[in-house]
Amino acid sequence: MISYYFQGFALGAAMILPLGPQNAFVMNQGIRRQYHLMIALLCALSDLVLISAGIFGGSALLMQSPWLLALVTWGGVAFLLWYGFGALKTAMSSNLELASAEVMKQGRWKIIATMLAVTWLNPHVYLDTFVVLGSLGGQLAMEPKRWFALGTISASFLWFFGLALLAAWLAPRLRTVKAQRIINILVGVVMWLIAFQLAREGVAHMHALFN
């Protein structure tokens, strides 16, 4: 059964490594050393719920609800555009230290709300967990399925805590004005590129719904 665990771990790691909204947010919180371990835990727990739902049967709900998928897609587009705009606005600020200080004033609940939006309004999360993991893990018998799910969940926990701790460790080097400007520009551009990609997918979904 351990082979199914490592299959799940490898697949989970492959899907979670690319830079996306979730990883960018965890990295930024780590650099700020602001609730970064709590955010890592909440991201990992969110993945636990999504992975379990996808592998143990939740994928059918998403595939049978095209309107739900369209709603999540356009909600994700709106959020990513807003999040990317905020990052670019901070990067282009004439007084980046002041802008960063304003961001640091965000309360715990606002940070948690942003994390939940970053995770749950990203349609790619549902495609990864419900479609990819659901189609692969769903074909297994119950015992191998549990080991497969445990492997993917382990990869998520290891990655988010590792990313948060590494970013916090590198914070003295990454909190310089130049580094923060580069990071915010990178995050903003990536968020807008993902939003553009989601918008194209959203248009395709809407076209399919009305034709």
From Swiss-Prot:
Q: Where is the signal peptide?
A: none
Question: According to the lineage, what is the superkingdom?
Answer: Bacteria
Query: Catalyzes what?
Result: L-arginine(in) = L-arginine(out)
According to Swiss-Prot or TrEMBL, what is its membrane topology?
Multi-pass membrane protein
Query: What GO CC annotations are associated with the protein?
Result: plasma membrane
GO MF terms held by the record: L-arginine transmembrane transporter activity
Q: Where in the cell is it found?
A: Cell inner membrane
**Pfam families from the xrefs?**
LysE (PF01810)
- Location (main, coarse): membrane
- InterPro entries in the record: Arg_export_ArgO_enterobac (IPR023445), LeuE-type (IPR001123), Lys/arg_exporter (IPR004777)
Q: Which UniProt keywords apply?
A: Amino-acid transport, Cell inner membrane, Cell membrane, Membrane, Transmembrane, Transmembrane helix, Transport
Question: Where is the chain membrane-spanning?
Answer: 1-21, 37-57, 68-88, 111-131, 147-167, 179-199
Family to which the UniProt record says this protein belongs? Belongs to the LysE/ArgO transporter (TC 2.A.75) family.
What this protein is reported to do is described as:
Involved in the export of arginine. Important to control the intracellular level of arginine and the correct balance between arginine and lysine.
Query: What PANTHER family does this protein map onto?
Result: ARGININE EXPORTER PROTEIN ARGO, ARGININE EXPORTER PROTEIN ARGO-RELATED
This protein is called Arginine exporter protein ArgO
